[in-house]
């Protein structure tokens, strides 16, 4: 685990302990059972593919550790509706506060504003966070293989699947891919950002995608800015893309989303 992830785990463990004191697991699980049913994250992506379209997981992100504040006029419901109007298949909402200025209530607000399935984008280290995600309406959770050992990843995945949610398993090297393939979830996200240096290159996806069995559902993450980037990744059978920063910086998010997904556009890549 990188030093960055170790620091994140330290504050996350403190957050989890405080949350457990405020709301015991049994109470949280009861809330999760009463929450709005999962909308089907993987199903929404496959529906886009069945229609011959790319599938976009559009991210609602206010800030990041590497870039600082990304969008000052940050309004999750407005952004969520803009993404849906632009053709997104799903939403991803940052809920981590210390590093991303996110919040669980941002996810609740974004989901309530649309009919799209929503990913809770956060660093999960405990199955308590899975129940927390479902209680707040999440349809999918994220497992970051760089942050977890195999046993913890399997426990978190099982808790999510048992609750009816989908799981996006994130990897960024061959070792993490081999470990991810031992899990049950079909979605494998290849993060083009090096979690140690924060540098991004689409070459990461190009190297790892051919190693993933065809029955898995590949997602390209980070470093994706233009239709040319989507075309480049599609050459290695990646048809689903998680994009946040490049869209969040646009004045007209709906128009930017439509432009990104336009297959006939081919401006030079801005990702490298």
Curated annotation (Swiss-Prot):
Its EC number is 4.1.1.48. Pathway: Amino-acid biosynthesis; L-tryptophan biosynthesis; L-tryptophan from chorismate: step 4/5. The keyword Lyase applies. GO terms for molecular function: indole-3-glycerol-phosphate synthase activity; phosphoribosylanthranilate isomerase activity. The keyword Amino-acid biosynthesis applies. InterPro entries: Aldolase_TIM, Indole-3-glycerol_P_synth, Indole-3-glycerol_P_synth_dom, Indole-3-GlycerolPSynthase_CS, RibuloseP-bd_barrel. Pfam families: IGPS. It comes from the Bacteria. It comes from Bradyrhizobium sp. (strain BTAi1 / ATCC BAA-1182). PANTHER family: INDOLE-3-GLYCEROL-PHOSPHATE SYNTHASE, TRYPTOPHAN BIOSYNTHESIS PROTEIN. It catalyses: 1-(2-carboxyphenylamino)-1-deoxy-D-ribulose 5-phosphate + H(+) = (1S,2R)-1-C-(indol-3-yl)glycerol 3-phosphate + CO2 + H2O. SUPFAM superfamilies: Ribulose-phoshate binding barrel. This is Indole-3-glycerol phosphate synthase. HAMAP family: IGPS_B (MF_00134_B).
